[in-house]
C-alpha cells in the first residue's frame, strides 16, 4: 500500500553545542531533509532522512530517580533519546530543557571552557518520580564548534 503525504515531515531535536568562546548552548533544530523512498524494496515508500556516519556505539542507560550528574561534556557527539521517564539538560548559558520519551537531543558540547563557577559542558539529571531510560548513539566523528543545527 502506498500512502504518501505530499509534504515531507520535520522532526525536532535539541542540539547542545559549543560556541567560539567555549560556552555551551541549546538550540531547537529541525531534521527536514526527507525523501520518499523504500528503505528496502519491495517495501512501500516512506519518508527517509539518511545521515551517514563513519561508525557508532549504542549505549543504554538507566538513571535512577533523583539522579543528577555533575557538570561534564558529552564524551562524543551523540544522539540521546529518552525511552521512558524524563530528564533535563542545563547548558552553561543557563538554559534548561526537559525531555521525555521520543524527544531527541544531540549532545555536542565538547571543547567547552570553564565559566566563572568552573562549570564545563552541561548538567543533566532525572525529572519526576520514575527512572529515565536513555538510548544513546555515540558518533565516531570530530565535534563541530559554533555550528548549531548542523544535522538537517
Specify the residue positions occupied by each region the protein language model found.
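Short acidic-glycine-tyrosine-enriched beta hairpin
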Residues: 93-111
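A short hydrophobic beta-strand segment most commonly corresponding to one strand
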Residues: 106-114, 118-144
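Short, conserved beta-strand element in jelly-roll/cupin
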Residues: 62-65, 73-89
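A short, N-terminal "cap"/entry segment at the start of jelly-roll beta-barrel domains
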Residues: 1-54, 149-152
Amino acid at each position: 500500500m502506498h500512502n504518501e503525504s505530499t509534504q515531507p515531515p520535520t522532526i525536532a531535536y535539541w542540539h547542545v553545542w559549543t560556541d567560539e568562546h567555549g560556552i555551551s548552548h541549546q538550540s531547537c533544530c529541525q531534521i527536514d531533509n526527507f525523501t520518499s523512498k523504500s528503505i528496502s524494496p519491495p517495501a512501500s515508500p516512506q519518508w527517509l532522512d539518511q545521515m551517514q556516519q563513519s561508525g557508532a556505539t549504542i549505549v543504554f542507560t538507566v538513571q535512577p530517580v533523583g539522579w543528577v550528574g555533575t557538570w561534564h561534556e558529552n564524551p562524543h557527539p551523540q544522539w540521546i533519546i529518552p525511552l521512558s521517564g524524563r530528564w533535563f539538560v542545563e547548558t552553561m548559558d543557563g538554559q534548561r530543557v526537559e525531555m521525555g520519551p521520543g524527544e531527541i537531543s544531540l549532545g555536542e558540547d565538547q571543547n567547552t571552557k570553564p565559566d566563572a563557577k568552573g562549570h564545563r559542558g552541561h548538567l543533566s539529571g532525572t525529572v519526576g518520580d520514575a527512572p529515565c531510560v536513555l538510548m544513546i548513539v555515540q558518533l565516531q566523528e570530530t565535534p563541530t564548534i559554533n555550528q548549531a543545527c548542523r544535522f538537517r
